């Protein structure tokens, strides 16, 4: 919502699953972030896959996510699609920009030094304390995000689209 300039929520629909890694004894993977806590006799009651769609007053957002994806590829990105071009923002990395020039689709990939995101986050927080500026982590933004997350969980549980 922050990226969309404070877009207002209209509807959400979401599905969650706990299927791919339900049986840890038979689940095959290359690596896992919680490998050191694995308990083959434990209970897996965590959603391992999510898919959804969000409508706002400015744009729509579709998303998929999985920690157990069974495709052997780790990808974290956000695509911004528009009538003049598109951007793929790689999580905590660079981006590529697609546009049309002289009747041809062109890919541009700016090279620049990426600052430490945690340092920048800390600096923005401290500056906001001094200036009173409302940053992306201001409580109003966080509450909208929390409302969105709750609605996504509710939609998945009720298996229907929800309106705001």
Give, region by region, the residue ranges found by the protein language model.
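Short acidic/polar mixed-charge low-complexity motifs
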Residues: 8, 57-61, 85-86, 103-105, ...
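C-terminal helix-rich "cap/oligomerization" subdomain common to oxidoreductases
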Residues: 111, 124-164
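Short polybasic amphipathic segments
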Residues: 78, 94-104
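A short glycine-threonine-serine/GTX helix/turn-capping micro-motif
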Residues: 39-41, 108-116
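Rossmann-like dinucleotide-binding domain that binds NAD(P)(H)
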Residues: 1-62, 66-72, 140
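Hydrophobic alpha-helical segments typical of transmembrane helices
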Residues: 8, 76, 121-125, 129
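A short local loop/turn or secondary-structure capping micro-motif enriched for an aromatic residue
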Residues: 69-73, 96-99, 115
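Active-site loop of classical SDR/Rossmann-like NAD(P)-dependent oxidoreductases
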Residues: 89-91, 112-123, 140
């Amino acid at each position: 919502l922050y990226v969309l300039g404070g877009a207002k929520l209209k509807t959400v629909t979401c599905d969650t699953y706990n299927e791919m890694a339900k049986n840890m004894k038979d689940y095959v993977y290359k690596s896992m972030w919680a490998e050191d806590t694995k308990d083959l006799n434990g209970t897996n009651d965590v959603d391992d896959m999510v898919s959804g769609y969000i409508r706002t007053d400015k744009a729509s957002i579709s998303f998929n996510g999985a920690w157990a994806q069974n495709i052997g590829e780790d990808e974290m990105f956000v695509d911004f699609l528009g009538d003049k071009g598109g951007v793929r923002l790689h999580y905590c990395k660079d981006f590529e920009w697609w546009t049309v020039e002289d009747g041809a689709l062109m890919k541009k990939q700016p090279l620049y030094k990426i600052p430490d995101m945690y340092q920048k986050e800390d600096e923005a927080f401290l500056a906001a304390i001094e200036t009173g500026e409302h940053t992306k982590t201001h409580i109003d933004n966080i509450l909208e995000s929390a409302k969105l997350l709750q609605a996504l969980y509710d939609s998945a549980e009720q298996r229907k689209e929800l309106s705001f």
